[in-house]
Amino acid sequence: MTVHVQLEFTPNPDTLKYTVSRPLLERGAASFDDAAEAAPLSPLAARLLGIQGVTAVMIGRDFVTLTVSDPTVMGDVHAVVLRDLPAWLDGGTEVVTSVWADRDHAGDYDDVAQQVIEILDAQIRPAVARDGGDIVFDRLDEGVVYLRMKGSCAGCPSSLATLKQGIEARLRQTIPEVLEVRAV
């Protein structure tokens, strides 16, 4: 079956989001910003990071988001992705290796942190994934939730508004112990 790739625009002008016609990951997202570090975990991400101008790759369930360092090379990056990504996926390039897939994705969290993670996973992450991004729980410290912005969320002009008006408001409404949300 030939994999089809389609560009979708995101609120972040520095990213390109490509939806693909087959699942890439069963759950979560894989983010990389160094080809050498990505190679043992995601051969696909390593190849994408090898494209001139690509500085970060995030792989989601059925999409890939690329962060591009220089807007003047966006067209070149797009042409390479449209040409090579379907061929790589059809040719069997591994999306993530068993080393990445077997990592422990769950931490040992207290009840409040677990509530935060459940809301993020059920309500927030699916919404930001539609724009090619991801928001990952980092830690909870004295009522402050620290989150990592990935993919098109990283560096997006509207990410602070999303963080404060959307995520912080939702978490504070549901979990009284949450006082603030910050990006790391």
Predicted regions and their residues:
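Domain-level signature for proteins that mediate thiol-based redox and metal-cofactor handling
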Residues: M1-V184
